[in-house]
Structure formats: C-alpha cells, structure tokens
C-alpha cells in the first residue's frame, strides 16, 4: 500500500457483469498483484471486477462518469444550472487550466484554457491534439474559438495552469501559462480592445 488511490476502469460485459476495461498487461503494470491473482489472460478476461478484487472489495469506492465533455454550467437563478458544451475544438484534448476574463473589452466574459496530456499509461494514445486557446464569449453562454492567426497564441505543449492579470498596466487583460516540461509563457494583450479603468484607493495608511 502506497496511500495513493488507483483507478480501475470498468465496463459492463456479458449478462451486465462489470469487468475491467484495460488488458491485464496494462492494469497489471499498475497493480502487479493481478498477474499472480489472475494467472493468465484467459482467466483474467473471463473474470469480473468483484472476482478479481474480492479481497479488497469492502475498501473499493465506485464512481461513475456521466460525461467526458468539457462543459460550462450557467446559473439559471432558481437554484438550478444549465449544462452547455464548449465548442468542438475544446473537446479534442483534456483541459488542465482555465481562466475567465474580458479579453476584447466588449463587456462580455471570455475564456482562455490550456490542454494536452502527452504522458499517459501504457496502451493509451497521447491526448495532445489541443492547444492554449482563447474563446470569445457571445453573452449567451456560447463562444467563438480564435484560431492561432487571430490570437497569436501558439502553445502546443502540456499546458497546466493559467493566470490572468494586467501585467503591463495598459488596461487590458494579459495571461501567463505554465507547461509540463516546457517554458512558462506570458502573453500581453495587443488587441484594439477598449482599455479598462484602473481604480486605486489611497486614503489612510491602513488601507494603502
């Protein structure tokens, strides 16, 4: 035991029995005791999750994913939220960093997000078809994705975290993005957007 929770992906098999989704070689690399427990591929493929993990069954936690899409949830104002899928381009790779801000100065919130995961488990394809992209809000929960020629943002590595601020104090929102095994990049807003108003409070020594 390492104290780290391991994920066992499962799927419904014949007669609605739950079986591991990954091959023995993949899951065994994560949980080596399975090689001895299952014996061979034939026995493993015909076993249910409960049969394979009977000894650990009481300590397992079952979680269910209802969607793998990247979504926005709009507050309906009555205690309920409306789910809205982000554009198709966003669904090409997992999102690891996201920030909200008005990047074009039209008074409508936009998004900047970072994607990609090149380092995956054995047997899984890299999830690196995404990039860092800016989504311009329409004001109704829908967005237009700027291409690289429009935004000038070209980051195709494993983006992780983003931070938004007016780094050069010109009244426009900029952003910085960090990457796994890549350089941290700062992008200064060079658009013709309307400049924001900077408010500085300066009264007593207490609130300076």
Task: Specify the residue positions occupied by each region the protein language model found.
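Beta-propeller-forming repeat regions
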Residues: 1-208
